[in-house]
Amino acid sequence: MGCQKEENAKEVVDYRNAIWTGHEQIKKDGFISTNTLVKIQGTIEHNRAGIRKLPGTELKNSVTGKTIYTPPQDEKEIRNYLKNLEDFINNNDDGIDPLIKVCLIHYQFESIHPFYDGNGRTGRILNILYLVLNNLIDSPILYLSKYINKTKQEYYKLFNEVRENNNFEDWILYILKGIEITSKET
């Protein structure tokens, strides 16, 4: 039991350190890059593995073991998707409201699933940094992890709805609800 508490505390500290690493990077650069995401993930996971180079990554239902989603497998393809995402994130002339855009960014990042591990935490930090970068929050303190973890079944259902049926509306409403609930709790 004590080891589990220590491990949980270590994970929280790593998450906090990753947020501040990313925050410092975007304040210095004025934008979010693939390199920023690699630094965040490396801080979370204490490794330098970087972008996935080997195929075989699948997202599985933790109860049934059934494959829910297979992200891109080829490193070059992953890097191309990340470059497109980076361009989308940093294009402020597209006319998309930043709150809507953060929902789309989250979906795209999780779909790319560029790392061997730490994608969920990195994606949630990306949300926070995007909101800071666009002056929607002053400090990186809006943690969607609790909301997403509490509603994980709905999260994956809506994630698949976008992928299979291009239903972004329910996904966007879900993420916005999470932002609203989390904002009130913060």
Q: Model features per residue range: what roles?
A:
Residues 1-186:
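FIC/Doc superfamily catalytic core
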